[in-house]
Each structure stands twice: as structure tokens, then as C-alpha cells.
UniProtKB/Swiss-Prot annotation:
CDD domains (alphabetical): SF2_C
Subunit organization: Interacts with G2. Might be part of a transcription complex composed at least of G2, A18, and H5.
Protein name: Transcript termination protein A18
Keywords carried by this UniProt record: ATP-binding, DNA-binding, Helicase, Hydrolase, Late protein, Nucleotide-binding, Transcription, Virion
Cellular component aspect of the GO annotation: virion component
Chief localisation class: virion
Native source species: Ectromelia virus (strain Moscow)
Length: 493
């Protein structure tokens, strides 16, 4: 650990790295506080900050030659086969680590790789290459299975722990597996942190963007007080401030043959209202809507909009245009509503729910991977990041208030490389609740802009798509009726 005075140059470097955001670190008293320039306190500067050679320091860090925590079960024959771009990442990592060892720098690297790149298999290859006992830390148990499958394929001795850390510590007294896969809440236990700091050399933080290391979290405390010898952050959407804890980044662009389309499903609704809606509208401008909780609650009870989403999904699914669908909502009650309605239409053999409150959901996710046709309804919290269903070909985004990082992660669920190349996203900028009309339009436009400008989607109007599709159930007369309704509504505003 390095306790340093917050001199101007150090503060400026940290500020630059976080894009001007406030910086919070542990001070010499162990308090997690916002750093102010010229502070009289000394601060605990994270080890990973010095992994970049651009950071000048006289500090010397230990290298792997001082430890003996080696994997005993490696079989080179079992090393996973990588694509050329994945091999390029491995080559970059090995080259960077040689330089780090030569310069006595911490072996900390962020793998900033696109959704669908294959971060998990690439990291498993690196793990086997290093031959060091490894901790794989995931934000939730849904991600456990994909790691388990690949670690087993590599043939490494491993153990999974998702529940009580106390019982795990008892087991570790008699056995110390080469690879330990845990959920991040285990890091709240100091005894466990001390154990892995002593007995494991490599720490892999999967989906590192899900942790805000400017908050006093278990992961923040672990990296500050029990820094591992080697560390990988894995993410497609890195948080700028997290660079303070892992300051060397490898990012390799991935060209894709996928045909990605985002359909804007617009419509013109008559104003819709209920007592419940009128009650929630009163809260839109209050402090209780600071994070747009009531905005999303209003969307969840916007019956005309919900019906439009269902009609669009049913039409596309029945036509065979899309086959493996992910439906995403912000709120659980919104998810349950869509699930029940779709279940009535298509039955339990086709419609599934990704409910965080159901312990069997991870097993259900595994079971649907091999299905040719299914509809999976879930929440942004549960399935917006890390959902491992590579065969997904379409996404219905039913919510609107989503930040850029969540948007990119969510769209990444349908950007996995498979033999089928068509990927389709549907967004719904219209609402029948006039008080949130412009707000919803602006939020959905942000989704559209990011998908087109950054992720290579092509924007198309769903109405034009229907008109050009001879199999569409939307008749010319119904389209004309909508146009007339639009004109009538505009004249009577």
C-alpha cells in the first residue's frame, strides 16, 4: 500500500483520468472521502494506478517471482482455441506484462473488448498461460455458468461459491482449488480477502463496469487494502474513474459481419389516463422522481403503448422474421405483465421469464440456449449485462430511461457472433401519456443515436418496414387510418 500526500501533479493526473469527476479514496485514517487538492491527509493510492508507464513513480512493486501460488492441474492440450483477434489480445497482454515486469510495475490490465468478442474464453486462455492460482469474481450468480463451462473445458481444478463465505473458508482450510469462482459480495469478509491475497495470485474482475469504485464498496476496499499480485478488469464499457484501480488498457476493435437494424416503432395514441396515472403525474416534478422512477412507472401502465409493443412482437414472431427474442423492462411488475400476456398467447414451451427473485432462473437460461424459438422476458437489472444466450437475434426495449453504459451493454446481448447474421432491435418512442411525451422521445432517441453512431446499427422506420413486407398483417387501409388520425390529432392540439 502506498500512502501519499495529494500533491498537485498527482491530483491533476487522477482528475484527468476520471474525466473531471470527483475522486474518492481511503485516507490514512481509513475513511473513504472525497479528495481535495492540497489536503493535509495522506491517501491510499491504488496499486493498479501505477500499472501504466505514463505514471511517474519511484515505487517498486513485487513481481511473480516472489510467490509460489502455481496451478497444479494445467494440461496444455486443453487450452481453448482462439480466433485471430483473440490471439492478438493474448499477444498484446503478454508483451505488456513483460514490460511491466521489467519496469517493476503492477501487473494490472483492463481488457476493454466489445460485447461478443469472447472475453471469457480469451481470459481463460490467459489464465492457463500464466499458470497462477486464480480468483474469478462476478457481480451476480447468473454469470457463474459461462465461467464454469470454460474453466472445466480447460481442465482446471475449480470450486464455485455463491452463498455463504463462512462455510467456504472452512472448506479452504483443507483444500485450495486452483480456480475459485465467487460472487463479489464474498469480498465483504476480511478473513476471505486476507486468504485470497495470500494464496491466489491472479484476480479477474468480470463486468468491471458494474462496480463504481468511487463508492465505498466491498470491491473498492479489497483492491485498496488487499491488492492482488495480478489483476484483469473485463468490460465492454469501462467506467473512466475505475482506471485509477487498473490503469493499463488493451482495446482491440472487432469487425463484424452482423447485419444490425434498429426499428423505431412509432405510433399516434389518443391521450390515456387513469386515477393511478393522474396520481403518479403529480410526482413527476418532485424529488421522488429524481431517478425517473415515476417516469418508468408511468410507462409500465401505459396500456396503448404496452399493446403496441405486444402487437409488434406477436406480428414479427408469427411471421418468422425473428425467432429468439429478449424483452427488457426496467420494472419487475412491467416484466411480469408482459410475461403473463405472452404466456397466454404462446404457452410455457415458448415464453420464459428471467426473474431475479427465482433461484431457478440460471438453470432455465441454460435450458433455453438450445431452443430454436423462444421469448425471454426480463429486467434491465437482471439481463442487461452478462446474459449469456449467444443465439438471441432480437431485442425489444420496453423502457426508456437508460444510461449510455447500460444501453451499450444491453445492445451487446444481441451482438454475439453466430452463423446467423441478422440482429434486430425494436424501440418505442411514443407514449399516450402527454406529460412524459417529450421526455420519453428524448430518452429513446439517445438509445437510437448510440446504437447507430457507436455500435453500427442501421436505423429504419418500422412502418416503412411493414409497407415493404408483403407478409405483414398491417393492411393499407389500417395505415391510411393511422395517417388520418395523425392529421386529425395535429389539428386538434
Amino acid at each position: 500500500m502506498s500512502l501519499l500526500k495529494m500533491e498537485y501533479n498527482l491530483y491533476a493526473e487522477l482528475k484527468k483520468m476520471t474525466c473531471g469527476q470527483p475522486i474518492s479514496l481511503f485516507n490514512e485514517d481509513g475513511d473513504f472521502v472525497e479528495v481535495e487538492p492540497g489536503s493535509s491527509f495522506k491517501f491510499l493510492i491504488p496499486k493498479g494506478f501505477y500499472s501504466s508507464p505514463s505514471v511517474k513513480t519511484s515505487l517498486v512493486f513485487e513481481t511473480l517471482t516472489t510467490t509460489d501460488n502455481k496451478i497444479t492441474s494445467i494440461n496444455p492440450i486443453n487450452a481453448p482455441k482462439l480466433y485471430p483477434l483473440q490471439r492478438k489480445v493474448v499477444s498484446e497482454v503478454v508483451s505488456n506484462m513483460r514490460k511491466m515486469i521489467e519496469l517493476k510495475r503492477p501487473l494490472y490490465i483492463t481488457l476493454h473488448l466489445a460485447c461478443g468478442f469472447g472475453k471469457t474464453i480469451t481470459t481463460c486462455y490467459l489464465m492457463a498461460t500464466h499458470g497462477r492460482k486464480t480468483i474469478i469474481c462476478v457481480p451476480n450468480k447468473m454469470l457463474i455458468h459461462q465461467w464454469k463451462t470454460l474453466v472445466e473445458a480447460v481442465g482446471l481444478e475449480h470450486k464455485i461459491s455463491i452463498d455463504g463465505v463462512s462455510s467456504l473458508l472452512k472448506e479452504l482450510k483443507t483444500q485450495s482449488p486452483d480456480v475459485l469462482i465467487v460472487v463479489s459480495r464474498h469480498l465483504t469478509n476480511d478473513a476471505f480477502c486476507k486468504y485470497i491475497n495470500k494464496h491466489y495470485d491472479l484476480f479477474i474482475l468480470d463486468e468491471s463496469h458494474t462496480y463504481n469504485l468511487m463508492n465505498n464498496t466491498a470491491v473498492t476496499r479489497f483492491l485498496a487494502y488487499y491488492p492482488p499480485m495480478m489483476c484483469y478488469f473485463l468490460t465492454a464499457t469501462p467506467r473512466p474513474a475505475n482506471r485509477i484501480y487498473c490503469n493499463s488498457i488493451i482495446n482491440i476493435a472487432k469487425l463484424s459481419d452482423l447485419k444490425k437494424t434498429i426499428y423505431v416503432v412509432d405510433s399516434f395514441f389518443d391521450p390515456y389516463s387513469t386515477d393511478n396515472i393522474r396520481h403518479m403525474i403529480k410526482r413527476l416534478d418532485g424529488p421522488s422522481n429524481k431517478y425517473h422512477i415515476y417516469t418508468e412507472k408511468l410507462l409500465s401502465v401505459d396500456e396503448p403503448r404496452n399493446q403496441l409493443i405486444l402487437d409488434t412482437l406477436v406480428e414479427e414472431f408469427k411471421s418468422g422474421t425473428i425467432n429468439r427474442i429478449l424483452v427488457i423492462t426496467k420494472l419487475r411488475e412491467h416484466m411480469v405483465m408482459f410475461y403473463k400476456r405472452l404466456l397466454d398467447l404462446f404457452g410455457p414451451e415458448v415464453v420464459f421469464i428471467g426473474d431475479a427473485q427465482n433461484r431457478r432462473t440460471p438453470d432455465m437460461v441454460k435450458s433455453i440456449k438450445e431452443l430454436n424459438r423462444f421469448i425471454f422476458v426480463s429486467t434491465l437489472f437482471y439481463s442487461g449485462t452478462g446474459l449469456d444466450i449467444p443465439s438471441l437475434d432480437s431485442l425489444f426495449i420496453c423502457s426508456a430511461v437508460i444510461n449510455n453504459m447500460q444501453i451499450e451493454q444491453l445492445l451487446g446481448r444481441v451482438c454475439r457472433e453466430t452463423e446467423l447474421l441478422d440482429r434486430t432491435v425494436y424501440v418505442f418512442p411514443s407514449t399516450s401519456i402527454k406529460e412524459i411525451k417529450y421526455m420519453i422521445g428524448n430518452f429513446v432517441q439517445r438509445i437510437i443515436s448510440l446504437s447507430v453512431d457507436k455500435l453500427g446499427f442501421k436505423q429504419e422506420s418500422y412502418r416503412k418496414h411493414q409497407e415493404s413486407d408483403p407478409t405483414s398483417t398491417c393492411t393499407t387501409s389500417s395505415r391510411e387510418e393511422r395517417v388520418l388520425n395523425r392529421i386529425f390529432n395535429s389539428q386538434n392540439r
